[in-house]
Amino acid sequence: MDSRICTSFARLMASALCVSTLLVTAMPFDLRRGSSDTDLDLQGHVDLGLDDLDKLRLIFPPGLIEEAFSQAQGKVDMPLPRQRTSSRSSERWAPKSKRFDFGFAGLDTYDAIHRALEQPARGTSNSGSGYNMLMKMQRHG
């Protein structure tokens, strides 16, 4: 498996773990007996404000939080995202997928630098690898 696929999958799983941790800590569960003795009916209620949810949307990819809410059993109150208005203060907390992508772009750049420093440049000695790495970063940048 390609290392980029593994890295992307690990990042996605880490995001899902963070979302599930936040949901579990914010959700008081009522444990009740289900139809049989071994079944438990988990009914949770999440009371997150719009500000909290909008901040989570800036950190995690679009759709991940909604998916986590939809998979939760029981009653979940899902606030709708804020609508954009003309004021700049409301746009600051509006969900933007570009902010999430930009956060991982820094990690991708770090991975590219790390790989370039580990591999010596072809046809040159190890002393030229730093210069070639900088040239690669200028082309990507």
From Swiss-Prot:
Any one of the GO CC terms: extracellular region
The keyword Signal appears for this protein: yes
Residue ranges, annotated region (Disordered): 75-94
Alphabetical GO biological process terms: neuropeptide signaling pathway
Tissue note: Neurons.
Histidine amide sites (modified residues): 140
UniProt signal peptide: 1-26
Compartment annotation: Secreted
Main location: secreted
Keyword field: Amidation, Cleavage on pair of basic residues, Neuropeptide, Secreted, Signal
Record's function text: Mediates intrinsic neuromodulation.
Protein name: Neuropeptides CP2
Organism: Aplysia californica
Phylogenetic placement of the source organism: Eukaryota, Metazoa, Spiralia, Lophotrochozoa, Mollusca
Gene, per the UniProt record: CP2PP
